[in-house]
From Swiss-Prot:
UniProt entry keywords in alphabetical sequence: Amino-acid biosynthesis, Aminotransferase, Histidine biosynthesis, Pyridoxal phosphate, Transferase
Modified residues (N6-(pyridoxal phosphate)lysine): 229
PANTHER family to which the protein is assigned, alphabetical: HISTIDINOL-PHOSPHATE AMINOTRANSFERASE, HISTIDINOL-PHOSPHATE AMINOTRANSFERASE-RELATED
Keyword Chaperone set for record: no
Name of the protein: Histidinol-phosphate aminotransferase
Organism encoding this protein: Roseiflexus castenholzii (strain DSM 13941 / HLO8)
Classification of source organism: Bacteria, Bacillati, Chloroflexota, Chloroflexia, Chloroflexales
The organism's place on the tree of life at top rank: Bacteria
InterPro entries in the cross-refs: Aminotransferase_I/II_large, HisP_aminotrans, PyrdxlP-dep_Trfase, PyrdxlP-dep_Trfase_major, PyrdxlP-dep_Trfase_small
GO biological process: L-histidine biosynthetic process
Gene behind the chain: hisC
Length: 371
């Protein structure tokens, strides 16, 4: 690119390390020389059972009975979905906003809070998008590492807030990629600090715990949720957040008007109408998580961390990072995809999403060969 053009672009973005997303399934299949149906995806914490039958039926009904809906812009206020979410989470629609996945809502919160030079606390190892998005807005990121068991260092966070004037903290509950639950008492202590606390509950349905009931009574609390994991709608990009009315007005001002597409809203509403089926699927995944964890823990040289999510973090107690990478690569050659993170504190770990029983058995068969 000519220097005259690059001079018009932000130099801080040129220096930014790009986020590494999951490679598309078809690309991976071609790279591995395997048919798509042979690939077992245990790398992105997706729902192995897919969307609910009612969601699929609702999408088919739109295509068959009202295809014109795809030709007109969607409801900018997400009226039907927010009403359904209000019934689901017990918060009024006025405290709920929807987005194209919780990723968009993370971005909106940072856009509303952070100016260049402002400070955000990050608690690694955690979801990398928090620090990535903060860097996009020119924020200074103060890292307060988690404990050996991946709990939040509350005193360290409080010190960073007092010392650096931090304005914002994102915490995944349960944490990704460790699966660590976040105690309600920890959240309540952090809410006493002069910061906006955003709790990312992407895996809340698997954990069975939430602090969304505190929204409204604690003005500095934001709770984010997604339909990607428990509802099996990752490909449609639909999430939501609940927060105090004084805060949510800022997000309504800056969000794109038609940010949630018609198909996503239809499928999300139908998923909430099919709640018993969805929660039954969640229960199956949780039960399979425990079975898989026990089987992995029985393998030599692997420590499995307790998880409240739909994935398991496993540390190599022998062989370190080289062994973790080798296991990932060996599994990939067999068409089984897991996640490896080249990050401090977890570079000798692999993360395994909980699949169907037969998928997990295929994983275990290979691990028994190479462990």
């Amino acid at each position: 690119m000519p220097a005259s053009i690059t001079g018009l672009l932000r130099p801080d973005i040129a220096a930014l390390e790009p986020y590494t997303p999951i490679v598309p399934l078809e690309t991976l299949a071609e790279r591995l020389g395997l048919p798509v149906e042979r690939i077992i995806k245990l790398d992105a914490n997706e729902n192995p059972y897919g969307p609910s039958p009612r969601a699929l039926a609702a999408l088919a009904a739109v295509e068959h009975d009202a295809p014109h809906r795809y030709a007109i812009y969607p409801d900018p206020d997400h009226t039907r979905l927010r009403a359904a979410l209000s019934r689901y989470v017990g918060q009024p629609p006025e405290r709920i906003i929807c987005g194209a996945g919780s990723d968009e809502l993370i971005d909106l919160i940072m856009r509303a809070v952070l100016r260049p030079g402002d400070v955000m606390v990050d608690c690694p190892p955690t979801f990398a998008m928090y620090s990535f998005d903060a860097a996009l807005y020119g924020a200074r990121i103060v890292a307060v590492p988690r404990t050996e068991q991946f709990d939040v260092d509350v005193e360290g966070v409080a010190e960073a807030v007092e010392r650096d004037g931090a304005k914002l903290l994102f915490l995944a509950a349960p944490n990704n990629p460790t699966g660590t639950p976040l105690a309600r008492t920890t959240v309540e202590r952090l809410l006493d600090l002069p910061i906006i606390l955003a709790i990312d509950e992407a895996y809340a349905e698997f954990a069975g715990t939430s602090v969304i009931d505190l929204v409204g009574t604690r003005p500095n609390l934001v709770v984010l949720r997604t339909f990607s994991k428990w509802a099996g709608l990752a490909g449609l990009r639909i999430g939501y957040a609940a927060m105090h009315e004084d805060v949510i007005t800022y997000l309504w001002k800056i969000k794109q008007p038609y940010n949630v597409n018609v198909a996503a809203e239809v499928a999300a509403v139908a998923s909430l109408d099919d709640l018993d089926e969805r929660l039954s699927t969640v229960a199956r995944i949780v039960a399979e998580r425990e079975r898989l964890a026990a089987a992995l823990a029985a393998l030599p040289g692997i420590h499995v961390y307790p998880s409240a999510a739909n994935f398991l973090l496993c540390r190599m107690t022998s062989g370190g990072a080289a062994r973790a990478r080798a296991i990932r690569d060996t599994l990939a050659q067999r068409g089984i995809l897991i996640r490896y993170f080249n990050r401090p504190g977890i570079d000798d770990c692999i993360r395994i999403s909980v699949g169907r029983p037969e998928q997990n058995d295929a994983l275990l068969d290979v691990l028994k060969e190479v462990a």
